[in-house]
UniProtKB/Swiss-Prot annotation:
UniProt function note: Antitoxin component of a type IV toxin-antitoxin (TA) system. Antitoxin that counteracts the effect of cognate toxin YpjF. Also counteracts the effect of non-cognate toxins CbtA and YfkI.
Protein name: Antitoxin YfjZ
Knockout or disruption consequences: Single deletion has no effect on expression of cognate toxin ypjF i.e. the probable operon is not autoregulatory. Single deletion leads to increased biofilm formation, deletion of 3 type IV antitoxin genes (cbeA, yafW, yfjZ) has no effect on cell growth.
InterPro entries, per the entry: Antitoxin_CbeA, CbeA_sf
Inducers of expression: Expressed in mid-log phase at considerably lower levels than antitoxin relB.
Lineage: Bacteria, Pseudomonadati, Pseudomonadota, Gammaproteobacteria, Enterobacterales
Superkingdom assignment: Bacteria
Family recorded in the similarity comment: Belongs to the CbeA/YafW/YfjZ antitoxin family.
Entry keyword Lipid biosynthesis: no
Amino acid sequence: MSNTTWGLQRDITPRLGARLVQEGNQLHYLADRASITGKFSDAECPKLDVVFPHFISQIESMLTTGELNPRHAQCVTLYHNGFTCEADTLGSCGYVYIAVYPTQR
């Protein structure tokens, strides 16, 4: 078992972090490039299954419009159904790093 923490590093738990592979304006999720820090509740898990693809679609749209640029680091924050997603290319020209967590109130 690896102790690697993927995605944007945030001091928030629980958190899903991932390094998504960018191919044009499309993103690919690789399970071996993702990690969960902390434990999502039984109520949060099904919601996470719904919001995750929504966030991916929003990020892909931002890549299409140029709002998110693979060559320049710029963190964007998205909200949906009680969850927050932070995304940034970190200027990596091929990856989008994300952190998804329950919205803090």
